């Protein structure tokens, strides 16, 4: 009797195990899901192949390719990169709009505390001018906001790619650089203005400094020191006397 019970129990268990599983409860990697993934992969591959053939037969215009490259280089930047003060420079500005121009639209307004103080001093001088004294610069300089700087030289002397547009919190910011350079290497025929040409040789030249800027390093955005024009100075050398 006991053998008959054992035989019936074993037959019942074998019958349960032999029932096929439903596709709705199919585990990951079962034929039901693998066939679906294989079908989607095949469709994706076929779509990419068709798109590639279409691009080869009808290549995109040059302007469109440049636009696509520009949008691809617009990498999303982590806002944490801007939280460290040591990366901030008064000569580097990230803005969605061009910086304001001055009234004459030839030089720009450098929004800095020191420059604000200088503007107040200049305003006082204009209010109370001194008629018996002339004030002239040794060299003539011009300052501009550079908006489309794509390449620069880093602190190691190597060329780097500068990010023009930065995607931050779904807003596109342009990276501006405030640069100052000489308007003319010889403001007067003898060189620098106000230098005694009988004893000195002089000329005006642009000097550089390094500022932190967002650059491209592979497919990542990184801070690097790059060289920009920052001042116009006078270089003098003593003339040799002929005996």
UniProtKB/Swiss-Prot annotation:
PROSITE patterns: NGF_1 (PS00248), NGF_2 (PS50270). SMART domains: NGF. It is found in: Secreted. One of its GO terms (cellular component) is synaptic vesicle. One of its GO terms (molecular function) is growth factor activity. Expressed by the venom gland. GO terms for biological process: cell surface receptor protein tyrosine kinase signaling pathway; modulation of chemical synaptic transmission; negative regulation of neuron apoptotic process; nerve development; nerve growth factor signaling pathway; neuron projection morphogenesis. Residues 19-125 form a propeptide. It holds the Pfam family NGF. InterPro entries: Cystine-knot_cytokine, Nerve_growth_factor-like, Nerve_growth_factor-rel, Nerve_growth_factor_bsu, Nerve_growth_factor_CS, Venom_nerve_growth_factor. Disulfide bonds join 139-204, 182-232, 192-234. Residues 1-18 form the signal peptide. Its main location: secreted. Nerve growth factor is important for the development and maintenance of the sympathetic and sensory nervous systems. It stimulates division and differentiation of sympathetic and embryonic sensory neurons as well as basal forebrain cholinergic neurons in the brain. Its relevance in the snake venom is not clear. However, it has been shown to inhibit metalloproteinase-dependent proteolysis of platelet glycoprotein Ib alpha, suggesting a metalloproteinase inhibition to prevent metalloprotease autodigestion and/or protection against prey proteases. Belongs to the NGF-beta family. This is Venom nerve growth factor 1.
């Amino acid at each position: 009797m006991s053998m008959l019970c054992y035989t019936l129990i074993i037959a019942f268990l074998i019958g349960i195990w032999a029932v096929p599983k439903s596709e709705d409860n199919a585990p990951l990697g079962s034929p039901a899901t693998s066939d679906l993934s294989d079908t989607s992969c095949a469709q994706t591959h076929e779509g990419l192949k068709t798109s590639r053939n279409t691009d080869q037969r009808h290549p995109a215009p040059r302007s469109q390719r440049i636009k696509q490259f520009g949008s691809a280089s617009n990498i999303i930047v982590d806002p944490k990169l801007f939280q460290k003060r040591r990366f901030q420079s008064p000569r580097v500005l990230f803005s969605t709009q061009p910086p304001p121009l001055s009234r004459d639209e030839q030089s720009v307004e450098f929004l800095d505390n020191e420059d604000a103080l200088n503007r107040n001093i200049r305003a006082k001088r204009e209010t109370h001018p001194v008629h018996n004294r002339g004030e002239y610069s040794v060299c003539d300089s011009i300052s501009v906001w550079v908006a489309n700087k794509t390449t620069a030289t880093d602190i190691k002397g190597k060329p780097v790619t500068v990010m023009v547009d930065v995607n931050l919190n779904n807003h596109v910011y342009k990276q501006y650089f405030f640069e100052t350079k000489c308007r003319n290497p010889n403001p007067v025929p003898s060189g620098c203005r106000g230098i005694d040409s009988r004893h000195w040789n002089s000329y005006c030249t642009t000097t550089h400094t390094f500022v932190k800027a967002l650059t491209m390093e592979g497919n990542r955005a990184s801070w690097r020191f790059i060289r920009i024009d920052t001042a116009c100075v006078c270089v003098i050398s003593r003339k040799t006397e002929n005996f």
